[in-house]
């Protein structure tokens, strides 16, 4: 019985990866990633003038200090991958059945039955429409700082990065009620548009 479950889970993993090939727009996604790494980083559309001004201030800081920007973008890519996973699995469950969807279900149960991380809770809120993906990344970044984790490449925060940390925390604290109302566009055809 356990052997059969393992084989079915492997089918689920292969189905998931095939879903990326079937439903992912790689050309478009690469353009988005490139824009994040450049000076055209998209914060999405904000619903309040003061929040927009704060976002511009944070955007400027992220462009000024490349180290912190790379950490932010690394998290953003990670979260978008999760959003994409959700999208492709919804499509697979919609159009395929039998062992394929059974494999997906078994695989997901095996992956997530042990624990739920803070990131996973953030992802759930994004999927439910209660949190924008940009806000989720900012909050995730804030959590990293509060836990005292080091920046990539095992470097401690510089004075400039400490300033960005404070800026991110202020951004969240001052606009939490608005951030929580922002909604990521979950429609498949617009899944890469963060506004």
Indicate residue ranges for each PLM-predicted region.
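Short, functionally important secondary-structure microenvironments
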Residues: 1-195
């Amino acid at each position: 019985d356990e052997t059969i479950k393992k084989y079915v889970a492997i089918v689920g993993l292969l189905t998931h990866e095939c879903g990326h090939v079937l439903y992912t727009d790689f050309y478009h996604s690469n353009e988005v990633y490139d824009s994040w790494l450049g000076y055209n980083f998209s914060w999405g559309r904000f619903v309040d003038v003061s929040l927009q001004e704060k976002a511009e201030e944070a955007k400027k800081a992220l462009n000024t200090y490349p180290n912190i920007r790379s950490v932010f973008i690394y998290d953003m890519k990670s979260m978008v991958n999760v959003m994409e996973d959700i999208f492709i699995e919804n499509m697979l469950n919609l159009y395929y059945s039998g062992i394929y969807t059974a494999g997906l279900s078994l695989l997901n149960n095996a992956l997530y039955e042990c624990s739920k991380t803070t990131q996973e809770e953030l992802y759930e809120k994004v999927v439910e429409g209660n949190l924008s993906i940009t806000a989720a990344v900012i909050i995730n970044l804030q959590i990293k700082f509060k836990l005292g984790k080091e920046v990539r490449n095992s470097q401690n925060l510089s004075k400039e990065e400490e300033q960005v940390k404070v800026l991110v925390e202020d951004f969240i604290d001052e606009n939490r009620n608005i951030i929580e109302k922002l909604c990521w566009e979950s429609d498949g055809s617009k899944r890469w548009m963060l506004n």
